[in-house]
């Protein structure tokens, strides 16, 4: 894949953590030769997911800290909310505002949205392409 790719927090978690080997390999293949973009919200969502994983003892504190460092170092262009506020509001009945921000960004940039959220990808109100892991 080449070009621009919108990445959501679920995708970034897979990219940065050692989930299943096949899914991690898929995520690394997807980002090859792409410019990653996301809403400004994404690093906060990933940080929250890391915190929850640590609290549930799915990762050690050391693993969480290293993953957080990788998140901070990840080369992702972050976009502010204001240019997408109207579309996020328009999608409010179909999905959460968090998901809507990713969708609105992908729609505006005419870029695929990489996610592991298959339910989001099935939402009828979206006008973007989704990149999902193999089943």
PLM regions with names:
Residues 8, 99, 117:
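Acidic active-site catalytic centers that drive phospho-/nucleotidyl reactions
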Residues 1-4, 39, 91, 103-135:
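Acidic, PIN/NYN-like endoribonuclease modules and their adjacent C-terminal/linker elements
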Residues 14-16, 49, 123-124:
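Residues that scaffold the ATP/ADP-binding catalytic core of kinase and kinase-like folds
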Residues 40-43, 63-93:
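Acidic catalytic patch
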Residues 11-12, 42, 84, 102, ...:
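Alpha-helix capping/helix-boundary segments
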Residues 1-41, 53-62:
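Short, well-structured N-terminal submotif of metal-dependent ribonuclease cores
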């Amino acid at each position: 894949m080449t070009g621009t790719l919108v990445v959501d927090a679920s995708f970034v978690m897979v990219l940065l953590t050692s989930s299943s080997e096949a899914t991690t390999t898929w995520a690394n293949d997807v980002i090859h030769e792409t410019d990653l973009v996301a809403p400004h919200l994404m690093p906060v969502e990933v940080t929250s997911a890391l915190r929850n994983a640590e609290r549930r003892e799915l990762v050690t504190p050391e693993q969480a800290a290293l993953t957080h460092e990788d998140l901070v170092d990840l080369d992702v262009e972050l976009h502010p909310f204001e240019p997408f506020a109207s579309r996020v509001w328009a999608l409010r009945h179909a999905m959460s505002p968090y998901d809507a921000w990713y969708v609105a960004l992908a729609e505006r940039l005419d870029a695929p949205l990489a996610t592991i959220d298959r339910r989001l990808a099935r939402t009828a109100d979206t006008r973007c392409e989704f990149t999902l892991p193999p089943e």
